């Protein structure tokens, strides 16, 4: 597919209304061609073979074959960029996170009532995510698992430095977007239980944050949770903003605390990575380490630069292992990243850089 060739999209959804609305929204963009639609995965299988789409939009819950089963088969037999269409419910959030773990690139939230008007309100986001998915590397999701890291396995530790982290010694700040739910899982899965505190921002709908925190907690030796306002930031813990709010850190004497911020979107995002990173630059400075993982757009790039200028070591995920090298690429081009690291080595480098941070 060249830049001049429209992105060929197949819509798979059991709702005729959703199929029609997505077709209308996507067809308005000259860079997209809707080549077909299917009411269930079994019909979709035949159309995929015949139409060879660049991107598939896939409803999670459908008759005849579960959307997750179909997705798993698709990614194993014919890897294709998939954008999930999911409901804004707790059950829908958990199912969508499972879909992302199986290889879906991104998702679009479907309103529970007045679906037609609701989807129209997301038209710009739908078009943007479909175009982004066409450029995504779905093969990057088949990554080998890295060994778990312990503090005595760090690469190049500072001679004589005690690898024990007190409350305010070190802080790791991470930002991610498209592809980030799985990238964050990989990173946290390989962090030791006594790692420095981690503060994170991942672009997600408000109703997804609780399920995401619970999912990460199941996969990590660290304690992963949604942050509460004023909560002390402790080693061995990782904090995410609660749904639809920014996360910042503040200094309180010899420790840091979480500050939940209900201010306006930044870079069109709420939560925004730049909000977190700028607070870390101002309040933790050289005691922090910053990282940007896979994601679309440029949120976090300027904040990471501010962290670097404040004395914090910084890194970004490399292009080869990123689903979308938007945010990491923007930070790299801005000169905000000291290192470019494959996903399977991010946890290792964060621990090593934490030991070296001043």
From Swiss-Prot:
The keyword Hydrolase applies. The modification 4-aspartylphosphate is found at residue 59. GO terms for biological process: chemotaxis. It is found in: Cytoplasm. SUPFAM superfamilies: CheY-like, Methylesterase CheB, C-terminal domain. InterPro entries: CheB-like, CheB_C, CheY-like_superfamily, Sig_transdc_resp-reg_Me-estase, Sig_transdc_resp-reg_receiver. One of its GO terms (molecular function) is protein-glutamate methylesterase activity. Phosphorylated by CheA. Phosphorylation of the N-terminal regulatory domain activates the methylesterase activity. It is an enzyme of class 3 (hydrolase). Involved in chemotaxis. Part of a chemotaxis signal transduction system that modulates chemotaxis in response to various stimuli. Catalyzes the demethylation of specific methylglutamate residues introduced into the chemoreceptors (methyl-accepting chemotaxis proteins or MCP) by CheR. Also mediates the irreversible deamidation of specific glutamine residues to glutamic acid. Contains a C-terminal catalytic domain, and an N-terminal region which modulates catalytic activity. PANTHER family: PROTEIN-GLUTAMATE METHYLESTERASE/PROTEIN-GLUTAMINE GLUTAMINASE (PTHR42872), PROTEIN-GLUTAMATE METHYLESTERASE_PROTEIN-GLUTAMINE GLUTAMINASE (PTHR42872:SF6). Belongs to the CheB family. This is Protein-glutamate methylesterase/protein-glutamine glutaminase 1. The gene is cheB1.
């Amino acid at each position: 597919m060249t830049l001049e060739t429209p992105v060929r999209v197949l819509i798979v959804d059991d709702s005729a209304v959703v199929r029609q609305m997505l077709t209308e929204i996507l067809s308005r963009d000259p860079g997209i061609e809707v080549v077909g639609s299917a009411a269930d995965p079994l019909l979709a299988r035949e159309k995929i073979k015949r139409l060879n789409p660049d991107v598939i939009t896939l409803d999670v819950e459908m008759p005849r074959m579960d959307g997750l089963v179909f997705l798993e088969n698709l990614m194993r037999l014919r890897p294709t960029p998939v954008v999930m269409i999911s409901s804004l419910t707790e059950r829908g959030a958990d199912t969508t996170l499972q879909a992302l773990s199986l290889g879906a690139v991104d998702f679009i939230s479907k309103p529970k009532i007045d679906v037609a008007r609701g989807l129209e309100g997301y038209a710009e986001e739908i078009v943007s995510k479909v175009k982004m998915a066409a450029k995504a590397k779905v093969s990057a999701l088949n990554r080998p698992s890295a060994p778990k890291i312990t503090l005595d396995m760090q690469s190049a530790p500072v001679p004589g430095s005690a690898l024990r982290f007190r409350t305010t010694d070190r802080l790791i700040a991470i930002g991610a977007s498209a592809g980030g739910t799985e990238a964050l899982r990989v990173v946290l899965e390989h962090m030791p239980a006594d790692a420095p505190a981690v503060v994170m921002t991942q672009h997600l709908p408000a109703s997804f944050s609780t399920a995401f925190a619970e999912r990460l907690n199941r996969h990590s030796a660290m304690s992963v949770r949604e942050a509460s306002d004023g909560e002390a930031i402790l080693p061995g813990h990782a904090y995410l903003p609660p749904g639809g709010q920014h996360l910042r850190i503040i200094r309180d004497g010899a420790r840091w605390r979480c500050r939940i911020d209900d201010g306006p979107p930044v870079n069109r995002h709420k939560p925004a990575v730049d909000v977190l990173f700028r607070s870390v630059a101002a309040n933790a400075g050289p005691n922090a380490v910053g990282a940007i993982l896979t994601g679309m757009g440029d949120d976090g790039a300027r904040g990471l630069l501010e962290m670097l200028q404040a004395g914090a070591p910084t890194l970004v995920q490399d292009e080869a292992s990123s689903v979308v090298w938007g945010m990491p690429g923007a930070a790299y081009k801005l000169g905000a990243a000291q290192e470019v690291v494959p996903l399977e080595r991010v946890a290792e480098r964060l621990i090593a850089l934490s030991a070296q941070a001043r």
